[in-house]
Amino acid sequence: MTNQIPSASSAADFGSSKSTSVDAVPNMDKSSSVRRKNIDSNGLQQTNQIEQAESSLNAEADHSEPERYGCTPSGKVFLLPKEQENRRSILETVDPRFSKTPWDWIVISSILAQVLLFFMTTGAVRRYSMMLCFFFWRISYDAGIGFLLHMQSNHRKVVTWISDFGFFDKENHPKLYDLTKKQLISKMDSSYNYDTSPLEFNSWLVFRHFVDLILMCDFCSYILMGLAWTCWPKVNIILQFLRIFGGIALIVFNYWVKMDAHRVVRDYAWYWGDFFFLLRSSLVFNGVFELAPHPMYSVGYAGYYGMSLLTGSYAVLFASILAHAAQFGFLLFVENPHIERTYGTDINHARLSPRGEDNEFELPPEHDLVGFVNFDFTRISDVALLIIALYSIFIILLSSNSHYSQFWAIFQAFVWRFLHSIIHAFILFYQSKSKAWTKHFIRNGESAAYAWSQWKGLYNLTLNMSYISFVMAAWKLYHLPSNWTYGLVSLRHALGFGLIALHIYTSVSIYEDLGQYGWFYGDFFLPSRSPKLVYQGIYRYVNNPERFLGCSAYWGLALISSSAWIFLIAILAQLSNLAIIRLVEQPHMQKVYGNTLRKEAGISKLIKQATSEKGNILPKTVETHMKALTTSVDKVLDQTAEALEEFVNTAPPKVQELLKGTESNLRKNAQLAILKLFAPQLSSSTHFDYKLEIKGIDNNQVLLGHPITVCWTASPNHEINDWIGLYKLSDNASDLYTQTSSEGRWSAIDANGYTSHCSSIKSLSNDKNSGEVEFSGDLLFWETGTFEFRYHYGGKHLVMAKTEPFVITATSMNTTDVDEVSAYLLKSIKFCDPNITPHDGDASLCDISEGSARKLTSIIKYSFGIDLSYRVVQVDGSCSALSRRIVNSLKILQSFDGPSGAKDD
């Protein structure tokens, strides 16, 4: 059976593209997508002819029943007869109450031959005979039907062969013609007209009969094989009950999948109708098609594993696995190529990287290393990964199996997993919160695309090494079983490899759906192109498939190795994965895409429908319990997120406060000793008037970089080596003694008192009891905040006077006009270095000193919010180039703050 979904549009619409709206009926994946393209290259030219034919058919049809139309490759439109359920057709074939056609007797004889073989043989002969029968019919299905469909898809050979063989040739093969006509009419509704139906439709009906033969014999042979291999495993009663209950549940589930799939796709897709003609009616894809990708080939074979449980036979299990794998091969090599050939491939919108007018977002082609795909020996990051990986592998392979070697393997796996989780979490957390990663690279003159490129290399390195080291640890702790039939040894290995295969499939599906942009968290580092998400591929069915399926290989290797240490690392990987998704990814998606995030995935909607519809097969309590479980898990994760965020926000200030408090206590003790030493001098000077004021200040605010003039007045008995320092208001708790160093931000009041820091003296009165000093350049703080000046006595740190606290502020520049930015920088440069006076934006800044460049980057940081390295100023070499860089950086960062849209949590 196929899960390829027929067209929901008219022939005139065959060439249209798919809707990408989240609110639309969900699109199927490539093998089950809404088919829109006409297989005839001249189909668009036949639109009028098709519409006229359809109008004629509509006039004659009975409007009381829904009508469906087919379209042949030649463009002929015909009315499809009403369907008779394939279940009824199959049951009538074996039901003795109905008359039988010659073909029915062929089918019955094939089934009875297998049953007879089952009862005529015993022991090993029966078991292997039944297994051979099953494999024969499986090969007939996958290879036989596959070959026929391949030839039909590529060359229309099945229709040609059936026609050439004489099935519809009344003149040359009248008996075969009559038998065919009688057989088809007996299995169809009264609305079917053999003579007027197109050749393609009648050929499809003949093809269906061969398919039914293979399907019925395949089913019968599998049941007989299961009965032949049935045994009673030696396990306790609880496991016996779980085995039987699980087997029955899987078989019932399999039956529901098949029936629900047939309800949706009907016989047309069940029997690969679109290999012969196209259907022209709308289908609503719900039910099982929202449960899993390729449901007819994935969950549709759950009954295989149910039967394996009931029989208790590993032979049946491995035969089922082999048959299931062959079915996926059928999908891969027969159906998917037909879909792509007939309907084209879908444009994967999620894979598209952001593009815009700004060259910043013109990303190079996708050639980054993913795993070891796209490996390039000329790329140092690729070579580094290869060297580290080979070192990690060979150090384990070449070492002995001692406890030390096992410890090293476990330690290596733990460290890489821990590093991957920590680096992954913290970089993405701070990137989402403040774009810290991007700003770091912009600061050094790089682009946002370069920042993302570096993240991709780091992420791929830690991800690959976490996998490689874990595999090597599992290898080191694995012991080859001496008895594969003992206990659950074979089952552990089968489940383990199954989980590994599931992990690989999930990862490949995620990458195919998201592309490199999504795989490497592009919307954390670059602006999203679309405000909405397209839920396609595996994301149609589940939100965050990597949440659990993304760690299935860890659990698979843990089962295979049967090591407690490997289980422990698997638990660490699973918990860290859950934490990153819940604490980092989901908040970011909510922030970027807002209310357009999907509330329910396909599986959730399916369960909800199953518990709400009339006559549902699931009790309402199932939905209630699942909601309660989900709520509980989310509540725990929310509380963890709040605690983690509180820790991240409060831990650094608390640590800083603790260190500062310790330092303050030490300084206070030293302060007391110094105050006692200088107490006589202080007591003799307390009656004199010391004053300190800032000249020309408005509202106690000063612009960043602007010179500050300080007026001072001192006692006639003051010392010539008195001095004035500039400090942050929060740096000194005492008003009597300065506890922190001025770090060069001080000025002498008298040139006779010092040999340096005298150039800032603007004036000194004749009696030398008052004067002015100007703080500029290196004497200033080049950051915003609240500050104060302090007058100190006699070259010491004894405070005689202070100014009122004042605030250094920066002009907020919100413009992205290059000329305005350049003009602002020209004004600011004179405060950074008075010796540089560029007259226009193209004047050279190549000779600017490191100190002056640092001052200019401080002004840029507080005025524009762009943190640049001083080297960038020197490299750009002019205000114009620097202005363009600032504007481009602003556009990059502002693009992250666009309107909220939608993305999957």
From Swiss-Prot:
Entry-linked Pfam families: PEMT (PF04191)
Annotated Gene3D superfamilies: 1.20.120.1630
Topology Cytoplasmic: residue spans: 126-128, 231-236, 290-313, 401-408, 480-493, 574-905
Pathway in which the depicted protein is active: Phospholipid metabolism; phosphatidylcholine biosynthesis
Residues recorded with modification Phosphoserine: 353
Localization per Swiss-Prot or TrEMBL: Endoplasmic reticulum membrane
Transmembrane segments: 105-125, 129-149, 210-230, 237-257, 269-289, 314-334, 380-400, 409-429, 457-479, 494-514, 553-573
GO MF assignments: phosphatidylethanolamine N-methyltransferase activity
Compositionally skewed regions (Polar residues) per UniProt: 1-22, 40-58
Recorded catalytic activity of this chain's protein: a 1,2-diacyl-sn-glycero-3-phosphoethanolamine + S-adenosyl-L-methionine = a 1,2-diacyl-sn-glycero-3-phospho-N-methylethanolamine + S-adenosyl-L-homocysteine + H(+)
Disulfide bonds: none
Membrane topology annotation: Multi-pass membrane protein
EC numbers for this chain: 2.1.1.17
Region (Disordered): 1-73
Topological domains, Lumenal: 1-104, 150-209, 258-268, 335-379, 430-456, 515-552
InterPro entries assigned to the protein according to its UniProt record, in alphabetical order: Phopholipid_MeTrfase, Phosphatid-EA_MeTrfase_fun
A GO CC annotation given for this chain: endoplasmic reticulum membrane
Assigned keywords, A-Z: Endoplasmic reticulum, Lipid biosynthesis, Lipid metabolism, Membrane, Methyltransferase, Phospholipid biosynthesis, Phospholipid metabolism, Phosphoprotein, S-adenosyl-L-methionine, Transferase, Transmembrane, Transmembrane helix
Annotated PANTHER family: PHOSPHATIDYLETHANOLAMINE N-METHYLTRANSFERASE
HAMAP family linked to this entry: PEMT
Protein name: Phosphatidylethanolamine N-methyltransferase
Gene for this chain: cho2
